[in-house]
């Protein structure tokens, strides 16, 4: 198969950027050239150069906002963003454009269609955002991380994630060897989650039966805040870190995860086969995190608590119930793995090749 150039448009948060990087790695392993279209201000401005990818940095701002001035300026801002994206596509001449989300993907998708470049859309969340609902009408192929997120034309391929997570032992094998205190992995994301910092230590300290082992990823911004909360709760043995480099190892270690329900987190939980208590971000756009969590709960792999539930003390009883029964946790882990899409990265890469070759 001849070498093709694939442009990946994604930016802003890890939920868009890291799946894009997974696909980029797969395409490069197959000998193709990949160029990234994003903004320097987003997460991609740091991690894309570190991955050794060529990039076009676009001066594009978000399109959502409130107020008459913002609404009145929208046509001009969108037109300028599409023009900037179009210039980048003329320079790079990609054979196919893959939109992976974030506000950069909208203008790039429009520019791709105006330039006659084949367009593939990938929607990571169970509830599609406004941009992808529009771009789905223009895409040559429409891919989703969850079933039925973009209607009848869409193909459920799953969310591309880090390969090592798929290679973990089965939940039954992992839990069969477990002894001692339960192990809780708390994921607050790169920005931290203040609600988890506050309420998880309180809940763990109240369940009794000895202290659990805790690994809490709190992000740089709320690191000291989280450490303080564990100290107040008397859980001095909790390990609170800004970032976890080896996520596969962390999932393999954990009995239970407490986390927000971003698309990437939910996909990794399914692939790893780890049960979870999910607390959707209350102000997530289109409330997509609630939809993500409900999908994993429907499979019997997770429990969902809303943030007000944490404030009312509901987390402690749920943790006590789950952490006291490793057999049940193993069953939930198997249920999680049962809905995983382990071939998502390769499938998206293959679809890029199919579209690029016409």
Swiss-Prot record:
E.C. number: 2.4.1.227
Pathway stated in the Swiss-Prot or TrEMBL entry: Cell wall biogenesis; peptidoglycan biosynthesis
Membrane topology of this protein: Peripheral membrane protein
Keywords: Cell cycle, Cell division, Cell inner membrane, Cell membrane, Cell shape, Cell wall biogenesis/degradation, Glycosyltransferase, Membrane, Peptidoglycan synthesis, Transferase
Record field: transmembrane: none
Residues at which UDP-N-acetyl-alpha-D-glucosamine binds: 13-15, 125, 162, 190, 244, 263-268, 289
EC supergroup of this enzyme: transferase
Catalytic activity: di-trans,octa-cis-undecaprenyl diphospho-N-acetyl-alpha-D-muramoyl-L-alanyl-D-glutamyl-meso-2,6-diaminopimeloyl-D-alanyl-D-alanine + UDP-N-acetyl-alpha-D-glucosamine = di-trans,octa-cis-undecaprenyl diphospho-[N-acetyl-alpha-D-glucosaminyl-(1->4)]-N-acetyl-alpha-D-muramoyl-L-alanyl-D-glutamyl-meso-2,6-diaminopimeloyl-D-alanyl-D-alanine + UDP + H(+)
UniProt feature coiled coil, ranges: none
InterPro entries assigned: GlcNAc_MurG, Glyco_trans_28_C, GlycoTrans_28_N
GO terms (BP aspect): carbohydrate metabolic process; cell division; cell wall organization; lipid glycosylation; peptidoglycan biosynthetic process; regulation of cell shape
UniProt-listed Gene3D superfamilies: Glycogen Phosphorylase B (3.40.50.2000)
GO CC terms, sorted: plasma membrane
Molecular function terms from GO: UDP-N-acetyl-D-glucosamine:N-acetylmuramoyl-L-alanyl-D-glutamyl-meso-2,6-diaminopimelyl-D-alanyl-D-alanine-diphosphoundecaprenol 4-beta-N-acetylglucosaminlytransferase activity; undecaprenyldiphospho-muramoylpentapeptide beta-N-acetylglucosaminyltransferase activity
Similarity comment: family membership: Belongs to the glycosyltransferase 28 family. MurG subfamily.
Function statement: Cell wall formation. Catalyzes the transfer of a GlcNAc subunit on undecaprenyl-pyrophosphoryl-MurNAc-pentapeptide (lipid intermediate I) to form undecaprenyl-pyrophosphoryl-MurNAc-(pentapeptide)GlcNAc (lipid intermediate II).
Protein name: UDP-N-acetylglucosamine--N-acetylmuramyl-(pentapeptide) pyrophosphoryl-undecaprenol N-acetylglucosamine transferase
Organism: Halorhodospira halophila (strain DSM 244 / SL1)
The gene coding this protein: murG
């Amino acid at each position: 198969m001849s070498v093709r150039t694939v442009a990946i448009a994604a930016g802003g948060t890890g939920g868009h950027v890291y799946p894009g990087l997974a696909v980029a790695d797969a395409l490069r392993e197959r000998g193709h050239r990949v160029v990234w279209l994003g903004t320097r201000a987003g997460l991609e401005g740091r991690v894309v150069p570190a991955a050794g990818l060529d990039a076009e940095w676009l001066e594009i701002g978000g399109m959502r906002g409130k107020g008459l001035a913002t609404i009145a300026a929208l046509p001009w801002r969108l037109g300028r963003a599409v023009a900037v994206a179009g210039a980048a596509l003329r320079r790079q001449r990609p054979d196919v454009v893959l939109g992976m989300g974030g506000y950069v993907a909208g203008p790039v998708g429009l520019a791709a269609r105006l330039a006659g470049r084949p367009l593939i859309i990938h929607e990571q969340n169970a509830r599609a955002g406004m941009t992808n609902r529009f771009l789905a009408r223009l895409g040559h192929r429409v891919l989703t991380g969850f079933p039925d997120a973009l209607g009848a034309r869409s193909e459920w391929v799953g969310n591309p994630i880090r390969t090592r997570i798929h290679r973990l032992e089965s939940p039954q094998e992992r839990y069969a060897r477990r002894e001692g205190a339960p192990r809780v992995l708390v994921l607050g994301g790169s920005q931290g989650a203040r609600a988890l910092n506050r309420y998880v230590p309180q809940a763990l300290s109240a369940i009794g039966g000895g202290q659990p082992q805790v690994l809490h990823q709190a992000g740089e911004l709320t690191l000291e805040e989280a450490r303080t909360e564990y100290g107040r709760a008397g859980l001095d043995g909790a390990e609170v870190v800004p970032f976890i480099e080896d996520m596969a190892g962390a999932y393999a270690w954990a009995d239970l995860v407490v986390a927000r329900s971003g698309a990437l987190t939910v996909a990794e939980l399914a692939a790893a086969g780890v049960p979870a208590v999910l607390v959707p971000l209350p102000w997530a756009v289109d409330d997509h995190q609630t939809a993500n969590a409900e999908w994993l709960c429907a499979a019997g792999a997770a429990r969902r608590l809303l943030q007000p539930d944490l404030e009312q003390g509901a987390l402690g009883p749920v943790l006590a119930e789950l952490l006291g029964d490793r057999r049940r946790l193993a069953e939930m882990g198997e249920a999680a793995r049962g809905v995983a899409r382990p071939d998502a990265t390769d499938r998206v890469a293959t679809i890029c090749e199919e579209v690029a070759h016409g």
